[in-house]
Amino acid sequence: MKITSLLLIGAFTLANGNIWATTGHQDSIERLRMSSEVLHSIVETPDKGIPEEVLSNAKCIIVIPHLVKGGFIFGGEHGRGIATCRTAEGWSAPAFVSIGGGSWGLQIGLEGIDLVMLVMNDQGFQHLLSNKFEISGDASASAGPVGRHASAGTDWKLNTEILTYSRSRGVFAGITLDGAIVEQDNDSTRTIYGRELTFRTILSGKVAAPKSTLGFMKAIAATDHTATIAEAKPDKE
């Protein structure tokens, strides 16, 4: 009887582990897909999107799809997304991120708000490589300019490390994210890469992008006609 019970418990635990692994992989793939859609919208709506000059000067792009749902403020929950940075060989493989806390300045009633953060200089890049940082605490940030001619000003070129944007119903707007914490999503990293990898390893271009991330990498390249992407490799099983 005891042996039977132990076998049942073991089988149940194994089944739950397999279900969690499958769900985690599907969630990570879906996040890549939604992030790609946000990037496509940047290219398709130049008059209402992020200025080309701003994008071309960005060292890293972070996309957090569907930050707000169901008419509630983001609050204490964690949004999750994807980051990639420029390297000598092109855009790096994608790193999985999470974000939470802080004062978002979002209005109740908005649905499907996507967040885009552009890291604009080396100091901001180093903060991102640290695996965890606080916006406006560790890294300076400001709402980014919007529209084809919005980049004419020079404020964003001076000392801002990160420019932040929200997107709702296809329209981009600058947003403040004071106090928000950005950190690595270790679970999704293990799920897609099959091992522990730091932000620094991924975003410095030291690993190739898995094949399951190719759609996202193509979407990133489409935002920058001069960009290239690393050769993809099979996912880790």
What positions do the PLM features span?
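Small-residue-enriched, tightly packed secondary-structure blocks
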Residues: T22-E237
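Bacterial N-terminal signal peptides that target proteins for export
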Residues: M1-L7
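Sec/Tat signal peptide C-region and signal peptidase I cleavage site
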Residues: N16-T22
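Bacterial N-terminal signal peptides
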Residues: L7-A15
